[in-house]
């Protein structure tokens, strides 16, 4: 197995390390050395939850999103140490999972001999790999221009800017990248979580897909938590607890939005009847 380092970026508006994040870190620690950095004021007690799964866990409010947390970790670890690894993973906690064997995905992508890869690809604004999970091989890790990209990163209010430029930046340097799941329809792939799992054993579900289903989910929402658990084997309590902590979920497989819509329709119908 290749020696991997994983830079895990975190954020929680209540400065809590959620259970689903602990599970994510635990699974990532099986395939890599995990370093965690959160944007916020996390207490040491919260960060200590990660002590069994990470080499380092810290937090600081920097307001530069995931790339800011990854930059902080790179500054802490140093390129000399990072270059000792065969692969560098960047990952954030905007995903539930994993729901499938990550080593199988690494084996599959290793056969294709890419210099960098992600799980999904995106055509918004320009073609790029989604940065919630990306992998960089040794030649990129050692490249001075890659170091400059991270070292020279500046604060920005555009949370997508660095994600959208990273893929073309590496391509212009002569590196070859691709996605594990191809997006031939140029659609929002992550809006179809169960389809992606069935067809590609997609290991993750985007948090915002379930957090804001009215805008981000294009599959039936009723009992989505139970269906996820039954079809993927992932403990849906991680999802329920997280969304409940956000005030967006009320059990029985109905999101806040779906339940709100249901009662709105019910009240409207009652008005008509009376």
State each model region's role.
Residues 1-274:
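ER/Golgi luminal nucleotide-sugar-dependent glycosyltransferases, focusing on the catalytic module
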